Curated annotation (Swiss-Prot):
UniProt xrefs under InterPro entries: SlyX
Family: Belongs to the SlyX family.
Domain of life: Bacteria
Alphabetized Gene3D superfamilies for the sequence: 1.20.5.300
Signal sequence segment: none
Protein name: Protein SlyX homolog
A Pfam family this chain is assigned to: SlyX
Species this protein is from: Haemophilus influenzae (strain PittEE)
Length: 73
């Protein structure tokens, strides 16, 4: 009977480990799906920004470093 109880305890431990691993696997899968969704969204935003940058027209106003200082300097 002692061996039977030890085997039952061992099986119970293994079943618990499997249950925890299945839960962890589900959580990791959910995180992976969410990350892929975020990556897809960022790629769309990156393409949008790249297109905006291509269409960017430089301004006729000089940058502050290119401006001549005012007369009182």
């Amino acid at each position: 009977m002692q061996i039977q109880q030890m085997l039952e305890n061992r099986i119970e431990e293994l079943e618990m480990k499997i249950a925890f691993q299945e839960q962890l696997l589900d959580e990791l899968n959910h995180a992976l799906v969410q990350q892929q969704f975020d990556i897809d969204k960022m790629q769309v935003q990156l393409r949008y920004m790249a297109n905006k940058l291509k269409d960017f027209q430089p301004s006729n106003i000089a940058s502050q470093s290119e401006e001549t200082p005012p007369p009182h300097y």
